[in-house]
Amino acid sequence: MTDSHTAGPFIAAIDQGTTSSRCIVFDRDGRIVSVDQKEHEQIFPKPGWVEHDATEIWTNVQEVVAGAVEKAGITRDDIKAIGITNQRETTLVWDKNTGEPVHNAIVWQDTRTDALCKELGRNVGQDRFRRETGLPLASYFAGPKARWLLDNVDGLRERAEAGDLLFGTMDTWVIWNLTGGVNGGKHVTDVTNASRTMLMNLHTMAWDEKIAESIGVPMQMLPEIRSSAEVYGEITGGRLGELLGGIPVASALGDQQAALFGQTCFSEGETKSTYGTGTFMVMNTGDKLINSYSGLLTTVGYKIGDQDTVYALEGSIAVTGSLVQWMRDQMGLISTAAEIETLALTVEDNGGAYFVPAFSGLFAPYWRSDARGVIAGLTRYVTKAHLARAVLEATAWQTREIADAMTKDSGVELTALKVDGGMTSNNLLMQTLADFVDAPVVRPMVAETTCLGAAYAAGLAVGFWNSTDDLRANWRRAAEWTPRMDADIRDREYKSWLKAVERTMGWLEDEE
């Protein structure tokens, strides 16, 4: 065992992510006992298209679960349940009799359904299904991806209508395989993943037949919608059946919702922000379903067993960590990602430069696909160190815009922001965040909040933890940054940022 003070029992969590799958074993204090991880191939058949091989992913999931258990030096008797968290919206259709995918999974970033989404919104605009689903018509969501497969793979629609095919996001694929696959695998999804298909009605928490018909997805393909924390079935069959047969599969949450749960944001108004390639900020809105008029998504936060559904508001930023990578790989201004902080610290401010990284348009709160990146305010005075600072400030200003939108929609002021993800190791960025959103920024001890959230939900489902109070008691602060910026300077610079954002819009003309 990796940790001398850790005695069982344990909970395991699978994180089926965009670039890799991993499994983490946690103890009762929410501490990490072991980790195993394996990357899978990113497939780019055409510009704007992104696919994954779901068979490769299932193979990797089995490997990392076996690997994490082996590294922890434990057996099936030590593991009380396994939970699942996953990249959201990534869409798969498979044959229920053979277990074979009919096509690669279409990944959330894939934009091939742009034209279909425009067509679906033709007379009514992108808010056609927003009142029921909380989502704008965008290529991001799963329903239109399923329709694309049905329209473009030979014979698929007939097979779907005959009841031979199953649709699912990655949680559904993993659960179906874990619980037996063709031999009685459970075809289920949880409310958080279902809320990202554009096919679930947030008011009824059930599939919306009218919307499914409008989008063109047969109801018989869809999984059963369950809560985020309950026993869906047991591990059976296959490689893991021998190793871990009988262990309950007891939670599923989309990755951002899992991070909200892992950060113990259980009260209305509590908010977390995950800083990775892009950034996702999620606010718990309690039992209130808040329609956003400020460009946020209304979504499900989580649902524990038969307790009430907890809703959330979400704002997503397309480019944050990937802007630092761009500075390193395309511009050559830094040689490692960590260097951005060192370079930015050599100057006091941004030298008047503002960098809006609208590389593929702007996400929340604008949703403008015609925008492209801009560096504004350039003079001869500006050095690469000023640009490094402008790069970090871009992430902080975009967070501020979403925080403002959340306050506007919910009427709740942000009192603190819990953060996680790779970029949180950048202390200058964290201080800048606190300064710009004018609230304390807090980083927890366990950075793997996504996996932790799935483990927590699974543990609650089997009584490993009794209540969310137990989980709150586990949450430990590693670092906190408080605002140190003069309010007048903040307001002045925010104005300049908003001016720079305006300059990005309308760059692409319709015919492009």
From Swiss-Prot:
ADP binds at T18, R22, T277, G321, G422, N426. Signal peptide: none annotated. Its EC number is 2.7.1.30. It comes from the Bacteria. SUPFAM superfamilies: Actin-like ATPase domain (SSF53067). It catalyses: glycerol + ATP = sn-glycerol 3-phosphate + ADP + H(+). Keywords: ATP-binding, Glycerol metabolism, Kinase, Nucleotide-binding, Transferase. Sn-glycerol 3-phosphate binds at T18, R88, E89, Y140, D255. The keyword Cytoplasm does not apply. ATP binds at T18, T19, S20, T277, G321, Q325, G422. InterPro entries: ATPase_NBD, Carb_kinase_FGGY, Carb_kinase_FGGY_CS, FGGY_C, FGGY_N, Glycerol_kin. GO terms for cellular component: cytosol. Pathway: Polyol metabolism; glycerol degradation via glycerol kinase pathway; sn-glycerol 3-phosphate from glycerol: step 1/1. GO terms for biological process: glycerol catabolic process; glycerol metabolic process; glycerol-3-phosphate metabolic process. One of its GO terms (molecular function) is ATP binding. Key enzyme in the regulation of glycerol uptake and metabolism. Catalyzes the phosphorylation of glycerol to yield sn-glycerol 3-phosphate. PANTHER family: GLYCEROL KINASE (PTHR10196:SF69), SUGAR KINASE (PTHR10196). Belongs to the FGGY kinase family. This is Glycerol kinase 2. The gene is glpK2.
